[in-house]
Amino acid sequence: MEELREAFEEGKPVILIDRNRENEADFVFPAQLITEDVVSFFVTYGKGLFCVTADEEDLLKRGFVKLSSNYGANYFVPVDWGTGTGISALERAETCRKLAEGRYFHEFRYPGHVTVIGGIGFQRRKGHTEASLEISELAGFSRHAVIVEILDEKGNSHNLDYVLKLSEKFSLPVLEMDDVWREFVKRKLLMKKKAEATLPTDFGVFKVVSFENHLDGKEHFAIVKEPLEDPVAVRIHSECVTGDVLSSLRCDCGSQLANFLRYMSAHGGILIYLRQEGRGIGLSNKIAAYSLQDKGLDTVEANRVLGFSEDERDYAPAAQILKALGIERVLLFTNNQRKTVGLEKYGIEVVETKRLYGRVTPHNRFYLSTKMKKLGHELEEIFREVNS
């Protein structure tokens, strides 16, 4: 973030690339620092719509008027500052700075030449508008930014080669949407403890903790058994109604859950229960995937046929729960290296990992083999035991 701030102070915008939107790229620059030269650069080399972004709530409090839309765009009435035409680079820069100062709508002339867009929160929408506000704030400036979509010589807005050459030519920093999301989750506390209660179970007496969730709105929860050592024994368990509740033999989820609860009862630890049914695709789609597996596809192939990636999960909620519980260092019980990476990228230190196996049955053997071969799950040991 210090490097980002230095670039902005030198008058260099950041290029923000969204690989989930066919590599669409925007210039991003803090509105409070914008100058005539930066505006001129944006217009010359960006060529897309020139916009200033701010939080929607902030704009509404200042009286800005939202335009009607039939496709979800969050545009407000465009404005100008001052008495000139408003179109020059000098005038547009001043308009952006006045917006960043917190000036009210009635102080501007409208309609003007600076398009205003309201952000609705990065956790709700991972778009350039919302990301630009986080970038500006992370670099130490107010939550107001100027963004311009980058078009190539033919007006194409999705030319990654052109964007990267532009970055190289002018020595501009490049960020991807995932980079911003990672810093956003690492630096902000978006979940906090809401309630906790005693939970007596067949495995022992635990605490169950719920959370106020401003990250994804889902009712994730944690099971805690004290005392907690450093590093804390942690298991991230993705919801599996069929395995956890109905004791399905198609997977090993229920038996893994039971095995960790037994461990917790004896040694202490935290079970994080994430509402990520079917590796993040939901129960209905999981059942559809089961149907495809009944026809001979494996679990990865079934996901892809349904239009999903092999694993749709993000472990940001798990990292946020640990932060809400005051945990920074963990002993992670997992066979899945993606969970280790998923915690570490959000600022949780995984000191060590330990394997946690479930039950192998004739019904889940092929499924487990697929997870090992195609998803990288470390299950070789359990297959050696079964085959011996």
Curated annotation (Swiss-Prot):
- TM annotation in the entry: none
Cofactors demanded by this protein: Mg(2+); Mn(2+); Zn(2+)
Name its pathway: Cofactor biosynthesis; riboflavin biosynthesis; 2-hydroxy-3-oxobutyl phosphate from D-ribulose 5-phosphate: step 1/1; Cofactor biosynthesis; riboflavin biosynthesis; 5-amino-6-(D-ribitylamino)uracil from GTP: step 1/4
Which Gene Ontology molecular-function terms are recorded?
A: 3,4-dihydroxy-2-butanone-4-phosphate synthase activity; GTP binding; GTP cyclohydrolase II activity; magnesium ion binding; manganese ion binding; zinc ion binding
For this UniProt record, the keywords arranged alphabetically read as follows: GTP-binding, Hydrolase, Lyase, Magnesium, Manganese, Metal-binding, Multifunctional enzyme, Nucleotide-binding, Riboflavin biosynthesis, Zinc
Q: Which reaction does it catalyse?
A: D-ribulose 5-phosphate = (2S)-2-hydroxy-3-oxobutyl phosphate + formate + H(+); GTP + 4 H2O = 2,5-diamino-6-hydroxy-4-(5-phosphoribosylamino)-pyrimidine + formate + 2 phosphate + 3 H(+)
Superkingdom to which the source organism belongs: Bacteria
Q: Where is this region: GTP cyclohydrolase II?
A: 187-388
The UniProt note on the cofactor reads as follows: Binds 2 divalent metal cations per subunit. Magnesium or manganese.
Q: Where is GTP bound in this sequence?
A: R235, I236, H237, S238, E239, Q256, E277, G278, R279, T299, T334, K339
EC numbers: 4.1.99.12, 3.5.4.25
- One annotated Gene Ontology cellular component of this protein: cytosol
Q: Which residues make up the binding site for Mg(2+) 1?
A: E22
The record lists Mg(2+) 2 as bound by E22, H128
Which residues does the annotation say bind D-ribulose 5-phosphate? R21, E22, D26, R125, K126, G127, H128, T129, E149
- Binding site residues for Zn(2+): C240, C251, C253
Which parts of the sequence are marked as the site Essential for DHBP synthase activity?
H113, E149
Q: Which SUPFAM superfamilies match?
A: RibA-like, YrdC/RibB
**Role:** Catalyzes the conversion of D-ribulose 5-phosphate to formate and 3,4-dihydroxy-2-butanone 4-phosphate.
Under NCBIfam families, the record lists: PRK00393.1 (NF001591), PRK09318.1 (NF006805), ribA (TIGR00505)
What the record says about family reads: In the N-terminal section; belongs to the DHBP synthase family.
Q: What is the name of this protein?
A: Riboflavin biosynthesis protein RibBA
Identify the gene encoding this protein.
ribBA
